[in-house]
A protein has these predicted regions:
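FAD-binding core/adjacent interface of flavoenzyme oxidoreductases
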Residues: 1-5, 9, 73-151
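Beta1-alpha1 glycine-rich phosphate/pyrophosphate-binding loop at the start
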Residues: 2-74, 153-154, 163-193
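Short, conserved loop/turn and helix-capping segments at secondary-structure boundaries
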Residues: 55, 59, 118, 127-130, ...
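A Rossmann-like FAD-binding core segment of flavoenzymes
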Residues: 76-79, 83, 171-223
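Short, well-ordered alpha-helical segments in soluble proteins
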Residues: 140, 144, 168-172, 207
Length: 223
């Protein structure tokens, strides 16, 4: 990549990366701005639940990043970062591309954490990105002909866990007994009381069991 000036590079194109890039551009900085991600599309995570239910299509929540940054003066580069040499200010990529930067912003987001619990990575589904969503959809499709209800456990009673439980109950209450496992003594521990009360009403209406003060020690294969 030929650059006359060392760029400001943002690694990661989630909400943080995109907003940082667009807001920095408003300052009319006299250096190139490059945003880099291994994926070609942005994922609007708050609507993953609606994609799961089929209320909206997957393409509606995954706009193309080149399109987002077209005519913005920001360069989007799809590539996978392998190493950062902080002493030399150099980024090294999967295809042997090296970029020397002037400023670096790391906004690579989060990944799931199994907390070293045995069997989690092998026997659980996650809900953090499009690949997770696709895997969960395939599993749910495979349960279409279930003769009896299975127990479906969701670990974590934060906003994501509660919303996912409600959505799955709306779609598959005839296939699953849905239960939420939470290690704390209440759901939505960081939310306002009103939000907790409304969430409890939604869960109670759907007859979703909440197992508080409960931790997972191991996850085994379904028998």
């Amino acid at each position: 990549m030929n650059l006359t000036k060392k760029p400001l590079v943002i690694v990661g194109s989630g909400f943080a990366g995109i907003n940082t890039a667009l807001n920095l551009k408003k300052f009319d900085l006299d250096i190139p701005i490059i945003i880099i991600d291994s994926q070609p599309s942005f994922l609007f995570k708050p609507l993953m639940y609606e994609v799961l239910s089929g209320e909206i299509k997957q393409w509606e929540v995954t706009p193309n990043l080149e399109t987002i940054f077209s005519n913005s003066g920001i360069t989007f580069l799809q590539n996978k970062l392998c190493e950062v040499d902080f002493s030399m200010n150099i980024l090294k990529f999967q295809d042997n591309l090296h970029i020397e930067y002037q400023y670096l912003v790391l906004g690579t987001g989060s990944s799931h954490n199994s907390f070293s619990i045995k069997g989690v990575d092998e026997n659980c589904y996650f809900f953090n990105d499009i690949n997770d969503l696709d895997k969960l959809k395939i599993y749910l499709q495979q349960t279409t002909n279930n003769v009896k209800k299975d127990n479906l456990f969701i670990v974590g009673a934060g906003p994501s866990g509660v919303e996912l439980a409600c959505k799955l109950s709306d779609l598959y209450s005839n296939r699953f007994n849905i239960k939420i496992i939470e290690k704390a003594d209440e759901i939505l521990t960081k939310n306002k009381i009103f939000n907790k009360e409304e969430a409890e009403k939604a869960l109670d209406k759907r007859k979703i069991d909440i197992l508080l003060n409960t931790t997972v020690e191991e996850v085994t294969e379904k028998e």
